[in-house]
Amino acid sequence: MKKLQQILNAKGAQLTEDGIIGSRTLTALDWYITNRINNNKWLRPKDGLVFLRTDTVFSNTFDDYCAVYKGGVCVAVVPCSTTAGDKYVFSPITHMGITGTAVAAEQQVIGSHHFVTNKKWSTLWLGAPYFQQIHAITIWRDGTRDRTMDRVNKQFGLFGINIHRGGVAAIVGSWSAGCMVIPDNHWFPITNNFVNGQIIDFTLLEI
């Protein structure tokens, strides 16, 4: 988490870059998110997730961040990936006549996802609770099959850009074709903050 602290310090925070996520780091993160949301004239989250994309590279790693909000308070931040893993970057699908892996654009969509869970996780998609896309969002479809994100082909719709577990490895691999994915050891604690059917917004900031 040192990288996040370095990013926040570059934006004006004064954090010790020790990789420890305490109240000062969460406060600084909330300050940054709130400023960006206000500048964009978006809605500040009450209960939900805010994704922070740190670069425009398909790194196949969890090098982005997800801030968790509960009751309007930023209660946690965890690593995530907001871009597809190598499987889909180098073997992209074709959708609506355009070949390319899906890359969610910076945006906020109100009520975009709902939480899906039950007592028997084995019956759930990917064997775990997840957030399912239920409203259209904007994506780029990148078909250049390299590690650089291109913003050429834009689409708007329901593409199954869900939010879910990202496995136990250090790489994204086949876990994401454009979904927001969070490593299992961070994902499962996050799910305790939500109930089945709960609706959240999709908020993605590029920093």
What are these regions (language model features)?
Residues M1-Y32:
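Short acidic, glycine/serine/threonine-rich helix-capping segments at coil-helix boundaries
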